A protein has these predicted regions:
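N-terminal signal peptide c-region/cleavage motif recognized by signal peptidases
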Residues: 17-19
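Extracytosolic ligand-binding ectodomains
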Residues: 5-12, 22-390
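N-terminal secretory signal peptides that target proteins for export/translocation
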Residues: 1-2
Length: 390
């Protein structure tokens, strides 16, 4: 066989393999390896892969395998838009998992609307970010909606909430929104007198001055608007200075390892969550598999977070939408199939997710149960449960 013929046959074989590859159903993914919420993002991809493996193990979608293509945003909004465009235009993804933060969603959702591709966040919770867009969805609940349940639970438990103060980071969108809008508004609605607030930067290591100011205010509760890392440092400094006020927060601090890492300094802290593994056998099975894979990857996790569960569910939502819309992955039908995924998700009712039955509201946010958790000695205890939409 001459070299030209051999080359022709190799090229022909490569081309023959292309259609099968092209029929893989591609999901884009926008993880954040840096930024104020990097610890929350670190294990989300493992959760997504569990869902992919489960779907593919039973034949995929009409015989077509699902797979994930990732682009790391490093927590930067401009890179999130670059990533979305690459995944949509170069990689021909049918839909996108993420981004994680509200700052990223602010720019990704309008970009996704222009392109015509669904992007679904597993963690963004700043109020009304998805509402103006048809392709922007969030498998999260509004922080105001969740924090109302925290305050209601505190009232029902008769925990002291007569006076409150607030500590929040000013250098990321959701922390600032929590500190300036969500926490003070809902605390006041609940009859709590807000006596003052302090601010800090996410990367600030020394929070002694802020803790001293909070000590002087001497309030029953201290609302925290930040990611997990500064919340840990603040709790430790408050207890070092002898401040006994109960810490309360939204889901922005909801790292599954938070209780273990803070230890006794966090005793009494109350936050909302949308995932509690004790809610079902399905949720427990997911967490067991998740912990096994996390350990195999050399990461330190003793439990799955609500953002891990939300990421798993996003993949399952997309699989459901692809089945219902009879998606093929055909490049010639890409725009129509992306829109069909959007329309199916928006019409979805009470999908049996890990977190409970989930639908999407008109504002693009998931309607899901809220679990109110209290920290004690390195563990989370369930103290309140609110069904979806209650």
């Amino acid at each position: 066989m001459n070299s030209k013929l051999a080359g022709f046959l190799v090229a022909s074989a490569a081309l023959a393999g292309t259609p099968a590859q092209a029929q893989d159903l591609r999901l884009g993914y926008l993880p954040s390896s840096a930024g104020p919420f990097a610890t929350l993002s670190r294990t989300n991809e493992i959760a997504a892969q569990i869902a992919i493996d489960e779907i593919n193990a039973v034949g995929g979608i009409a015989g077509r395998k699902m797979r994930i293509i990732s682009f790391d945003t490093a927590g930067k909004p401009d890179q999130a838009v670059v990533g979305l465009r690459k995944l949509a235009e170069d990689d021909k993804a049918l839909a996108v998992i993420g981004p994680l933060s509200s700052a990223e969603c602010r720019v990704v959702f309008p970009a996704g609307e222009r392109i015509g591709i669904v992007a679904m966040s597993m963690a963004s919770s700043a109020p009304k970010l998805a509402e103006p867009f048809t392709y922007g969805l969030r498998n999260t609940s509004d922080e105001g909606y969740m924090f109302q349940r925290v305050m209601k639970t505190l009232q029902e438990k008769k925990y002291p909430i007569a006076t409150g103060s607030i500590a929040y980071a000013t250098d990321d969108v959701i922390s600032k929104t929590m500190g300036e809008a969500v926490l003070p508004s809902i605390m006041k609605q609940s009859g709590t007198e807000v006596k003052g607030s302090v601010t800090f930067q996410t990367q600030a290591f020394d929070l002694a001055a802020q803790a001293s100011q909070l000590k002087a205010l001497a309030t029953d509760v201290i609302g925290v608007g930040s990611g997990p890392e500064p919340a840990i440092r603040l709790a430790q400094e408050l207890r070092r200075q002898g401040v006994s006020g109960r810490l309360i927060a939204g889901s922005t601090v909801g790292d599954s390892e938070l209780a273990r890492r803070i230890g006794a300094d966090g005793n009494g802290t109350v936050i909302p969550g949308t995932f509690y593994p004790g809610v079902s056998g399905k949720a427990q099975k997911f967490e067991e598999e998740f912990i096994k894979r996390v350990k195999a990857a050399g990461l330190e996790r003793s439990a799955a977070s609500q953002f891990d569960a939300a990421t798993y569910d996003i993949v399952q939502f997309y699989a459901y939408a692809m089945k219902e819309a009879k998606v093929t992955g055909d490049a010639a039908r890409l725009a129509d199939e992306r829109t069909a995924i959007r329309d199916t998700l928006r019409a979805m009712k009470s999908y049996p997710a890990l977190e409970g039955p989930i639908s999407f509201g008109k504002n693009g946010d998931a309607l899901k149960p809220v679990y109110v958790l209290e920290m004690q000695n390195g563990h989370w205890n369930l103290i309140g449960t609110y069904p979806a939409g209650s």
